[in-house]
Swiss-Prot record:
Identification of the protein by name: UPF0179 protein NP_3406A
Family assignment from sequence similarity: Belongs to the UPF0179 family.
Pfam families on file: UPF0179
Domain of life: Archaea
Amino acid sequence: MSTVTLLGERLAEVGTEFVYGGETDACEGCPYREQCLNLTEGRRYRVTGVRDSGTLECAVHDTGVTAVEVEPAPVLANVDANAAYAGSKASLVGPCPYTECPSHEFCEPDGADFDEEYQITEVVGDPPHDYCMLDRELQLVQFAAEE
């Protein structure tokens, strides 16, 4: 089910994914707060439609905001290979200090927390790294979009 919200003009394109960061100090006193701050903080969303409603001024987005339709988006993540089964639940294996690793974005994905379990909808396959610097056996999976 899609939700109508306001999004920065530069991000307002069908297919764009983002993690909602919540309210900032600049939002205080804004007349559009109700329409803009209606998503769940920390959740990943995908823009599914852009409304033809014009641009509104915004203290956060320098080019203003526009109305868009968004839906929760799935998250790609690396999990323990022994827990990687479609339909099962898994959690992230823990933080990784190797930020240059090609898998880092999947070991610490935006939109997922270390202390939560997520439903696996698909086992994508091997992660993009050749070997894990922490000796973890990992599989790349897709977590279900949170409703």
